[in-house]
């Protein structure tokens, strides 16, 4: 599912998995073109993540819907619904789990295209990059 083949035939895509994700939620999926820029940095990834629309925050056992707002809005106090809450590192870490580019920064770099192959292909991928 992450290759140009489907059911033993060429499917017309370099990566069918990438093609499906491209139409799922373009704000939080796909290939981040800035990662190929000279001088690419973690700061650029943070800037990108700050502008990705949020889903929610979790407070006092409840999810608070923040759809349509960015983490940048939240951290700058621009969201009336949560004006009494201050962003926490837990909020940031939760937000980062809702972003799904092809290569995702976590405590490691998650190569998302490798999550949909058979066991031999998955092992080969990690051998290649490991």
Protein language model annotation of sequence segments:
Residues 1-130:
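C-terminal accessory/tail domains of diverse enzymes
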